[in-house]
Amino acid sequence: MRIVINGFGRIGRLVLRQILKRNSPIEVVAINDLVAGDLLTYLFKYDSTHGSFAPQATFSDGCLVMGERKVHFLAEKDVQKLPWKDLDVDVVVESTGLFVNRDDVAKHLDSGAKRVLITAPAKGDVPTFVMGVNHQQFDPADVIISNASCTTNCLAPLAKVLLDNFGIEEGLMTTVHAATATQSVVDGPSRKDWRGGRGAFQNIIPASTGAAKAVGLCLPELKGKLTGMAFRVPVADVSVVDLTVKLSSATTYEAICEAVKHAANTSMKNIMYYTEEAVVSSDFIGCEYSSVFDAQAGVALNDRFFKLVAWYDNEIGYATRIVDLLEYVQENSK
């Protein structure tokens, strides 16, 4: 599979890192970003959160060079001018965060790409896939797909375990979310909402999120049953989902733990992880699981009403699932 990465920010860089780390058969042929290639090479090599990577990487003749591997840098703002046909691109990993509307993303197809994977919640009629939850519903005819958000990738596997074992009447989710590149280091104006412009490392900032509602895109039985909000907090990486849920059938917290533990060792293996350790957020920096269920943190009010907690590295965990989905698409498009 020949892919290009459109947008070499946090997620774009970590997708490339994970492809190289696992020696994936995926071939990255180009990166399109308006930032200078030598600076992007530097940012790829040195990461303040996840440490240095590919120390032998250099910038030469407009390429990111790693031994025998060369990835061409492009800096084209107009999607319709990108040379995807000439490069024989199978999939565009759309990770700018700017193109999430189906009509906008379709311009990659007009430029010659065979498929587009949006690394964000999509707008419009775009199939959404979460590994371990509904990825097997992928149809090769789907030429524009979404991997949802990092938070949906954490919440949806947990919701599926609950749905399959106990049923879900309704639920509210809060994600206590690490700071992201859209936030300001110091107070300033925000286009999205006033509070979002306040200093990221001085404040706990309430924010909106569609992550809980998006679970209904991959688990239709839960459409209209989940919603939620976010608190942006002053940490660089790792977030946590707090799910307050009313189940359809009576059970115990211990039974929920057993159901999650079983799923983590079987159907959700490599997607979910179960822990009874006294963990904190920094313990999960670099964690490749989508959802780490914290058995010590949850509580029960009665036999149908529970608060459940799951951790996730909102960067590495999500980037890993993108690579998983790419490889799944490759295997199931032949």
UniProtKB/Swiss-Prot annotation:
Pathway: Carbohydrate degradation; glycolysis; pyruvate from D-glyceraldehyde 3-phosphate: step 1/5. Gene3D superfamilies: Dihydrodipicolinate Reductase, domain 2, NAD(P)-binding Rossmann-like Domain. Its main location: cytoplasm. Signal peptide: none annotated. Keywords: Cytoplasm, Glycolysis, NAD, Nucleotide-binding, Oxidoreductase. GO terms for biological process: glucose metabolic process; glycolytic process. Pfam families: Gp_dh_C, Gp_dh_N. InterPro entries: GlycerAld/Erythrose_P_DH, GlycerAld_3-P_DH_AS, GlycerAld_3-P_DH_cat, GlycerAld_3-P_DH_NAD(P)-bd, Glyceraldehyde-3-P_DH_1, NAD(P)-bd_dom_sf. Its EC number is 1.2.1.12. NAD(+) binds at residues 10-11, 33, 77, 119, 314. GO terms for cellular component: cytoplasm. One of its GO terms (molecular function) is glyceraldehyde-3-phosphate dehydrogenase (NAD+) (phosphorylating) activity. The active site is at 150 (nucleophile). The keyword Nucleotide-binding applies. The keyword Ion transport does not apply. It is found in: Cytoplasm. It comes from the Bacteria. Belongs to the glyceraldehyde-3-phosphate dehydrogenase family. PANTHER family: GLYCERALDEHYDE 3-PHOSPHATE DEHYDROGENASE (PTHR10836), GLYCERALDEHYDE-3-PHOSPHATE DEHYDROGENASE-RELATED (PTHR10836:SF76). Catalyzes the oxidative phosphorylation of glyceraldehyde 3-phosphate (G3P) to 1,3-bisphosphoglycerate (BPG) using the cofactor NAD. The first reaction step involves the formation of a hemiacetal intermediate between G3P and a cysteine residue, and this hemiacetal intermediate is then oxidized to a thioester, with concomitant reduction of NAD to NADH. The reduced NADH is then exchanged with the second NAD, and the thioester is attacked by a nucleophilic inorganic phosphate to produce BPG. This is Glyceraldehyde-3-phosphate dehydrogenase. The lineage of its organism: Bacteria, Pseudomonadati, Chlamydiota, Chlamydiia, Chlamydiales.
